[in-house]
């Protein structure tokens, strides 16, 4: 293991894992970082980088060029799409699907059975560069659906079973089992056709 660079998960092709030779599994960001733990059934495609000090459950799948940074915990049966960035110190539950070009900043929490559409952007800094502040990403509770090109502002909570429509800019909490639409997002009743848990 080099002080800053490549390390490797033990026996990367064992335990029914498929890891492309152009993927980096175990990027050592400090001299004493620990190689990642990845469960059975993983498929990690070319260009993906997974840092040390990451814990991932079974049946993990990436697209091409995904990034998972340090101190991230990911549950079972999770998809991280092509060019999606998970910027570390983040907790993601099980049965989660993140599509292409999603950005997840540090200090974000994602529950179980959550869908995140392409090019969704989560944020954790309310005053970029201009003020010093604690970074706080959004919290997505269980069974949340996030549409394409949604922006979630720092520290907001999207409640259980809520649905955020494509293109919405969410500046405040979204109550459970509601629909958020528009810029800035307005809260509306959730249509019956969209109610119920996600089957991911």
Language-model features: where?
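Flexible, glycine/small-residue-enriched loop-and-beta-strand segment within the central core
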Residues: 2-5, 18-156, 184, 191-192
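C-terminal substrate-recognition "lid" of short-chain dehydrogenase/reductases
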Residues: 156-158, 174
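Active-site phosphate/pyrophosphate- and oxyanion-stabilizing loops and adjacent acidic/basic residues
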Residues: 168
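Conserved beta-strand-loop-alpha-helix hinge in the C-terminal portion
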Residues: 176-199
């Amino acid at each position: 293991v080099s002080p800053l660079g490549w390390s490797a998960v033990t026996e990367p092709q064992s335990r029914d894992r498929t890891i492309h030779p152009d993927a980096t599994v175990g990027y050592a960001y400090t001299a004493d970082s620990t190689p990642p733990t990845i469960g059975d059934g993983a498929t990690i495609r070319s260009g993906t980088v997974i840092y040390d000090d990451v814990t991932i459950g079974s049946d993990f799948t990436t697209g091409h060029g995904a990034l998972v940074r340090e101190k991230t915990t990911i549950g079972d049966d999770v998809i991280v799409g092509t060019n999606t960035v998970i910027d570390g110190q983040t907790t993601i539950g099980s049965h989660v699907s993140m599509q292409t070009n999603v950005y997840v900043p540090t200090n974000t929490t994602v529950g179980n059975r959550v869908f995140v559409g392409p090019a969704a952007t989560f944020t954790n800094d309310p005053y970029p560069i201009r003020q010093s502040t604690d970074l706080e990403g959004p919290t997505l509770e269980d069974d949340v659906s996030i549409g394409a090109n949604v922006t979630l502002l720092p520290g907001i909570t999207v409640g259980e079973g809520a649905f955020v429509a494509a293109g919405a800019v969410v500046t405040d909490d979204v109550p459970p089992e509601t629909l958020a639409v528009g810029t800035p997002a307005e809260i509306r009743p959730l249509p019956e056709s969209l109610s119920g848990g996600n089957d991911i």
